[in-house]
Amino acid sequence: MVKLAIDMMGGDNAPDIVLEAVQKAVEDFKDLEIILFGDEKKYNLNHERIEFRHCSEKIEMEDEPVRAIKRKKDSSMVKMAEAVKSGEADGCVSAGNTGALMSAGLFIVGRIKGVARPALVVTLPTIDGKGFVFLDVGANADAKPEHLLQYAQLGDIYAQKIRGIDNPKISLLNIGTEPAKGNSLTKKSYELLNHDHSLNFVGNIEAKTLMDGDTDVVVTDGYTGNMVLKNLEGTAKSIGKMLKDTIMSSTKNKLAGAILKKDLAEFAKKMDYSEYGGSVLLGLEGTVVKAHGSSNAKAFYSAIRQAKIAGEQNIVQTMKETVGESNE
């Protein structure tokens, strides 16, 4: 049995989509228990494997992260993180303030001893449909080569345990594929990754080939990773809008769109980030999953499923035994 703590109040569409996703999750997974944290006036679920705990405060999207965690002690996000810290819950999921959730992860859940800097990881789609693990996407703006090596170690475990990939191929995001390409950070990181024989490091990868499906894990610093992530999200939205506008521009195009409707739907599903769940803050003493702030019920459900798999696979313990102990 896996028990998860859920922030009912975080996100643009909370609590409705959270309640819908939780209801579906407990129906689909008979070995899942949920502790919901939020406003009792907005709670309307009744299930033997769902426990509700009232919280008098909520962390808003515009709140300053660290200050909010310290001052709003009875907020749904803080109480959720405390449930993970105490061991009452195996992991947690929130669509709330990203900075506040990372602060709650660091200051409440706690960092694994030996992990220098936790990393935020996300699974992104590829043209072949299998996707790839990408980190860091914003936990740390600055990074040293040693941090990128550790990100690769964390990503390697994540790809194996969560995505079920044996001996995942690991790449370093760079401006060229040659070993000597890049700045001092990427050059030194390349050396460290190449000398870690526990990793299946396959070399550099350029941004233009990220979605080709040639690798399983891509490592970069949080500043670069966040910009790449937002660029991909923005590009996908723009292409979708352009395609829709083109289809609706004439009768001929509308007929073509109708003929291709099924194929376009399959393509959209393949490229839908919500199929992969949320982003995960790796390197903590518990599983912390960040669902997208604008998540619908489907995306939040995927994030719950992701946290459940992490609990089943005992990913935190694996990280303690490998990354943590090797860096003490």
From Swiss-Prot:
<dbReference type="GO" id="GO:0008654">
    <property type="term" value="P:phospholipid biosynthetic process"/>
</dbReference>
<dbReference type="GO" id="GO:0006633">
    <property type="term" value="P:fatty acid biosynthetic process"/>
</dbReference>
<dbReference type="Pfam" id="PF02504">
    <property type="entry name" value="FA_synthesis"/>
</dbReference>
<comment type="function">
    <text>Catalyzes the reversible formation of acyl-phosphate (acyl-PO(4)) from acyl-[acyl-carrier-protein] (acyl-ACP). This enzyme utilizes acyl-ACP as fatty acyl donor, but not acyl-CoA.</text>
</comment>
<keyword id="KW-1208">Phospholipid metabolism</keyword>
<dbReference type="InterPro" id="IPR003664">
    <property type="entry name" value="FA_synthesis"/>
</dbReference>
<dbReference type="GO" id="GO:0005737">
    <property type="term" value="C:cytoplasm"/>
</dbReference>
<keyword id="KW-0963">Cytoplasm</keyword>
<keyword id="KW-0443">Lipid metabolism</keyword>
<dbReference type="InterPro" id="IPR012281">
    <property type="entry name" value="Phospholipid_synth_PlsX-like"/>
</dbReference>
<dbReference type="GO" id="GO:0043811">
    <property type="term" value="F:phosphate:acyl-[acyl carrier protein] acyltransferase activity"/>
</dbReference>
<comment type="subunit">
    <text>Homodimer. Probably interacts with PlsY.</text>
</comment>
<keyword id="KW-0594">Phospholipid biosynthesis</keyword>
<keyword id="KW-0808">Transferase</keyword>
<keyword id="KW-0444">Lipid biosynthesis</keyword>
<comment type="similarity">
    <text>Belongs to the PlsX family.</text>
</comment>
<protein>
    <recommendedName>
        <fullName>Phosphate acyltransferase</fullName>
        <ecNumber>2.3.1.274</ecNumber>
    </recommendedName>
</protein>
<comment type="pathway">
    <text>Lipid metabolism; phospholipid metabolism.</text>
</comment>
